[in-house]
């Protein structure tokens, strides 16, 4: 049985863009408040008072359009992956589409699958363009992720996102998809019920049954279908809830950490949830050379992974200079203490 996901037409990325808010809080500051030592990362990004998943998505989408150099009205689908959408009943995708000038002749919808909502949207965009139904489709993954005060998730849950415009493969394409592979199981590792402010997690399911099983299975499935080995890839980006987990995956798969570190940003911006691998890939595209092959594997609790093989093309050299690079946002910092952080994140709930 053929398990590789590959559209009829070859498709690729014609534009990409990321956005990370400028505010930061150090893990040391969070630990000071809660009396905790030993931290999973160094610091994380924090959204401003007027920023949410929608505004992050808009900024990322605008950067993607700068690199694509296309009329936004040519985009026939805009799909937004997030688990922190501002409205329970009202699509966020329509707000983004209106803000970038893509309305009204397009399909728009919000996607949900915990931290892999962004790549879920990307899979749909690849299929939509690859079937011939549209010239361009945009997939966005962005979050202002939540963590209960004092919970270990609070040390990593952060804000950021990235957008990708998918189009038919041409010489103007920045990179193209060789194929993808998706893997899902019903694993109760993380959830948030309706009307609850913060997610809960089943600790014993978090590591091996959820994250490691899904990501490794998806990565191995993709490589098996494409008849590749880990050595065939120049870069690898895995979902990054922290620094330890993706480096452990790389070690298990036999991928040197030097191929992972360029896209591993969680140590300095935290876990951007639906944006995590999308932001990581954007950082890799900012430095990759034509001909480089990239392994891209997301993860979403509940649980599942999407794996992609991406080959960089010549057009990357010019187009990546047309918008701010990911590290430009990462290196732009203003630190908050815990009181201001709690205000920015709306943690004062009466």
Curated annotation (Swiss-Prot):
<protein>
    <recommendedName>
        <fullName>Hydroxymethylglutaryl-CoA synthase</fullName>
        <ecNumber>2.3.3.10</ecNumber>
    </recommendedName>
</protein>
<comment type="pathway">
    <text>Metabolic intermediate biosynthesis; (R)-mevalonate biosynthesis; (R)-mevalonate from acetyl-CoA: step 2/3.</text>
</comment>
<dbReference type="InterPro" id="IPR016039">
    <property type="entry name" value="Thiolase-like"/>
</dbReference>
<feature type="active site" description="Proton donor/acceptor">
    <location>
        <position position="239"/>
    </location>
</feature>
<dbReference type="GO" id="GO:0003985">
    <property type="term" value="F:acetyl-CoA C-acetyltransferase activity"/>
</dbReference>
<feature type="binding site">
    <location>
        <position position="115"/>
    </location>
    <ligand>
        <name>(3S)-3-hydroxy-3-methylglutaryl-CoA</name>
    </ligand>
</feature>
<feature type="active site" description="Proton donor/acceptor">
    <location>
        <position position="83"/>
    </location>
</feature>
<comment type="function">
    <text>Catalyzes the condensation of acetyl-CoA with acetoacetyl-CoA to form 3-hydroxy-3-methylglutaryl-CoA (HMG-CoA). Functions in the mevalonate (MVA) pathway leading to isopentenyl diphosphate (IPP), a key precursor for the biosynthesis of isoprenoid compounds that are building blocks of archaeal membrane lipids.</text>
</comment>
<comment type="subunit">
    <text>Interacts with acetoacetyl-CoA thiolase that catalyzes the precedent step in the pathway and with a DUF35 protein. The acetoacetyl-CoA thiolase/HMG-CoA synthase complex channels the intermediate via a fused CoA-binding site, which allows for efficient coupling of the endergonic thiolase reaction with the exergonic HMGCS reaction.</text>
</comment>
<keyword id="KW-0012">Acyltransferase</keyword>
<feature type="binding site">
    <location>
        <position position="271"/>
    </location>
    <ligand>
        <name>(3S)-3-hydroxy-3-methylglutaryl-CoA</name>
    </ligand>
</feature>
<dbReference type="InterPro" id="IPR004656">
    <property type="entry name" value="HMG_CoA_Synthase"/>
</dbReference>
<feature type="active site" description="Acyl-thioester intermediate">
    <location>
        <position position="115"/>
    </location>
</feature>
<feature type="binding site">
    <location>
        <position position="204"/>
    </location>
    <ligand>
        <name>CoA</name>
    </ligand>
</feature>
<feature type="binding site">
    <location>
        <position position="206"/>
    </location>
    <ligand>
        <name>(3S)-3-hydroxy-3-methylglutaryl-CoA</name>
    </ligand>
</feature>
<dbReference type="GO" id="GO:0004421">
    <property type="term" value="F:hydroxymethylglutaryl-CoA synthase activity"/>
</dbReference>
<comment type="similarity">
    <text>Belongs to the thiolase-like superfamily. Archaeal HMG-CoA synthase family.</text>
</comment>
<feature type="binding site">
    <location>
        <position position="239"/>
    </location>
    <ligand>
        <name>(3S)-3-hydroxy-3-methylglutaryl-CoA</name>
    </ligand>
</feature>
<keyword id="KW-0414">Isoprene biosynthesis</keyword>
<dbReference type="Pfam" id="PF08541">
    <property type="entry name" value="ACP_syn_III_C"/>
</dbReference>
<dbReference type="GO" id="GO:0010142">
    <property type="term" value="P:farnesyl diphosphate biosynthetic process, mevalonate pathway"/>
</dbReference>
<feature type="binding site">
    <location>
        <position position="244"/>
    </location>
    <ligand>
        <name>CoA</name>
    </ligand>
</feature>
<feature type="binding site">
    <location>
        <position position="301"/>
    </location>
    <ligand>
        <name>(3S)-3-hydroxy-3-methylglutaryl-CoA</name>
    </ligand>
</feature>
<feature type="binding site">
    <location>
        <position position="156"/>
    </location>
    <ligand>
        <name>(3S)-3-hydroxy-3-methylglutaryl-CoA</name>
    </ligand>
</feature>
<dbReference type="GO" id="GO:0019287">
    <property type="term" value="P:isopentenyl diphosphate biosynthetic process, mevalonate pathway"/>
</dbReference>
<keyword id="KW-0808">Transferase</keyword>
<dbReference type="InterPro" id="IPR013747">
    <property type="entry name" value="ACP_syn_III_C"/>
</dbReference>
């Amino acid at each position: 049985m053929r398990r590789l996901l590959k559209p009829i037409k070859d498709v690729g990325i014609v534009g990409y863009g990321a956005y990370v808010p400028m505010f930061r809080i150090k893990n040391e500051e969070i630990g000071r408040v809660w009396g905790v030592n030993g931290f999973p990362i160094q610091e994380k990004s924090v959204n401003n008072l007027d920023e949410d998943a929608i505004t992050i998505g808009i900024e990322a989408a605008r950067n993607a359009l700068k690199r694509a150099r296309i009329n936004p009205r040519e985009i026939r689908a805009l799909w937004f992956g997030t688990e922190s959408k501002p409205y329970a009943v009202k699509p966020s995708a329509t707000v983004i589409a209106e803000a970038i000038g893509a309305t009204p002749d397009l399909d728009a919808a919000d996607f949900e699958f915990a931290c892999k909502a962004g790549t879920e949207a990307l899979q749909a965009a690849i299929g939509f363009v690859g079937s011939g139904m549209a010239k361009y489709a945009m997939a966005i993954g962005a979050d202002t992720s939540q963590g209960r005060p004092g919970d270990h998730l609070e040390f990593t849950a952060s804000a950021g996102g990235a957008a990708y415009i998918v189009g038919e493969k041409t010489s103007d394409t920045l990179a193209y998809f060789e194929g993808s592979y998706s893997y899902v199981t019903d694993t109760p590792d993380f959830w948030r019920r309706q009307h609850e402010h913060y997610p809960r997690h089943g600790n014993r399911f978090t590591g091996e049954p959820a994250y490691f099983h899904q990501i490794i299975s998806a990565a191995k499935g993709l490589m098996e279908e494409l008849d590749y080995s880990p050595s065939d890839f120049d870069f690898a980006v895995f979902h990054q809830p922290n620094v330890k987990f993706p480096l452990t995956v790389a070690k298990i798969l036999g991928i040197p950490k030097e191929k992972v570190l360029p896209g591993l940003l969680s140590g300095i911006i935290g876990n951007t949830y639906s944006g995590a691998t999308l932001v990581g890939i954007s950082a890799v595209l900012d430095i990759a050379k034509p001909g480089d092959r990239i392994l891209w594997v997301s993860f979403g609790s509940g649980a599942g992974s999407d794996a992609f093989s991406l080959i960089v093309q010549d057009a990357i050299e010019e187009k990546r200079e047309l918008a701010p690079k990911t590290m430009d946002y990462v290196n732009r910092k203003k630190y908050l203490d815990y009181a201001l952080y709690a205000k920015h994140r709306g943690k004062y709930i009466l």
